[in-house]
Amino acid sequence: MVLMNKKAIMKLALMLFLLGFTANVVDARFDSTSFITQVLSNGDDVKSACCDTCLCTRSQPPTCRCVDVRESCHSACDKCVCAYSNPPQCQCYDTHKFCYKACHNSEIEE
């Protein structure tokens, strides 16, 4: 009887785990360039990453986050969140102790 009870509990736990695992919906677009850079990283990710609007805390060391909204996140981003819109609006939620270089010139583009 105890063995049957353990089997039932294990089956229920496995079913709940699989249900929770398959219920997660991920809205992702396949970008071959970011896929290749994730698989074969050569250290250029940080060099190619950029941010026009970077916010930092006043703590020492500062905690900085890029608040740019774009169609895709840069290749060095680990936590990219995209809105369900067309075109997609994505924002990187990584935090660092520094800001990336600016993507555009500080002059207003026409």
From Swiss-Prot:
One GO cellular component term noted in the UniProt record for this chain: extracellular region
UniProt superkingdom: Eukaryota
Disulfide feature: C50-C103, C51-C66, C54-C99, C56-C64, C73-C80, C77-C92, C82-C90
Leader peptide range in chain numbering: 1-28
Pfam families named among the record's database cross-references: Bowman-Birk_leg
Positions of the propeptide removed during maturation: 29-42
Swiss-Prot/TrEMBL site (Reactive bond for trypsin) positions: R58, S59
MF (Gene Ontology): serine-type endopeptidase inhibitor activity
Site annotation Reactive bond for chymotrypsin: residues: Y84, S85
UniProt keyword terms in alphabetical order: Disulfide bond, Protease inhibitor, Serine protease inhibitor, Signal
InterPro entries attached to this UniProt entry: Bowman-Birk_prot_inh (IPR035995), Prot_inh_BBI (IPR000877)
Family listed: Belongs to the Bowman-Birk serine protease inhibitor family.
Role description: Inhibitor of trypsin and of chymotrypsin.
Subunit structure: Monomer.
Designated name of the protein: Bowman-Birk type proteinase inhibitor
Organism listed in the record: Lens culinaris
